[in-house]
């Protein structure tokens, strides 16, 4: 598989671990608690959002640190969220759904839902 070929680890969810309609934070929390190592920052890239670069992630983490934020999200130049989420571990370890200390970075990522979005 692509992940195997590129040395990317996969966290498989048990069938009854989460439901399709669960909030994204629930899914991310499940993944975080199934890691063997505790991280201070967790980066989530949605598979249907190509175009985000490692430099965007670095910029987001630096923005988080500089402004003492708990969450940074990526937005395109059109102001639409584009699948890049950078979370402080406190967000995943708490019962909060969203952060009160949120920032954003502009990236070239784009969220794809339909064929027309590829154009």
Locations of the language-model features?
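Conserved N-terminal catalytic core of the sugar/cofactor nucleotidyltransferase
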Residues: 1-38
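Conserved core of the sugar-phosphate nucleotidyltransferase
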Residues: 21-30, 41, 46-119
């Amino acid at each position: 598989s692509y992940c195997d070929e590129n040395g990317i680890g996969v966290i498989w969810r048990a069938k009854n671990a989460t439901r399709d309609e669960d909030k994204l934070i629930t899914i991310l929390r499940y993944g975080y608690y199934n890691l063997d190592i505790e991280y201070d920052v967790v980066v989530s890239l949605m598979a249907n959002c190509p175009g985000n670069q490692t430099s965007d992630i670095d910029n987001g983490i630096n923005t988080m640190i500089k402004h003492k934020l708990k969450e940074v999200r990526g937005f395109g130049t059109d102001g639409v969220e584009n699948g890049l989420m950078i979370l402080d571990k406190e967000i995943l370890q708490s019962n909060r759904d969203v952060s009160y200390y949120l920032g954003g970075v502009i990236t070239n990522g784009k969220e794809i839902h339909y064929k027309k979005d590829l154009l």
